[in-house]
Curated annotation (Swiss-Prot):
PANTHER family: PROTEIN TIFY 4A-RELATED-RELATED, PROTEIN TIFY 5B
Native organism: Arabidopsis thaliana (Mouse-ear cress)
GO cellular component term, pick one: nucleus
Family: Belongs to the TIFY/JAZ family.
Biological-process GO terms, alphabetical: defense response; response to jasmonic acid
Keywords, alphabetical: Jasmonic acid signaling pathway, Nucleus, Plant defense, Transcription, Transcription regulation, Ubl conjugation
Annotated TM spans: none
Keyword Kinase among record annotations: no
Induction: Up-regulated by jasmonate, wounding and herbivory.
Protein name: Protein TIFY 5B
Residue stretches making up the Tify domain: 54-89
Length: 148
């Protein structure tokens, strides 16, 4: 699934209009807490040029899924977050089903409490294995171990 959010002067209705649209800002403006000063200065330059544009721009959401394209301009922030959440859940479910079909993973874990239980059991096994190996290393380096 590919999701593209664009700022455009008018809503796009189909793919041909999207190809013909020339005045679109494709930058999502997703910044992390540690971005470099060059990017920050280029962002300031682009935003200063946008100040002269009218503020009538609408948010366009374009979704490519299963070979289909859907373009929408009437989404709220909450609806966009819901779509992204559903998409990430779908991707996670598909990756889990692929791993379980390979036989390399245990069956799908249904909820967080069961997942926590599996993580706790895994941590116990790992700690037990570590302690056994450590005791064997200590015994192997002990001067009295050779004479037993």
């Amino acid at each position: 699934m590919i999701i593209i959010i664009k700022n455009c002067d008018k809503p796009l209705l189909n793919f041909k209009e999207m190809e013909m649209q020339t005045k679109c800002d494709l930058e999502l403006r997703l910044l992390t807490s540690s971005y470099d000063s060059d990017f920050h200065s280029s962002l300031d330059e682009s935003s200063s040029s946008e100040i002269s544009q009218p503020k009538q721009e609408s948010q366009i959401l374009t979704i490519f899924y299963n070979g289909h394209m859907c373009v929408s301009s009437d989404l709220t922030h909450l609806e966009a977050n819901a779509i992204l959440s559903l998409a990430s859940r779908d991707v996670e479910e598909k990756s889990l089903s692929l791993r379980s079909s390979d036989g390399s993973d245990p069956p799908t874990i249904p909820n967080n409490s069961t997942r926590f239980h599996y993580q706790k059991a895994s941590m116990k096994r790992s700690l037990h294995s570590f302690l056994q190996k450590r005791s064997l290393r200590i015994q192997a380096t002990s001067p009295y171990h050779r004479y037993r």
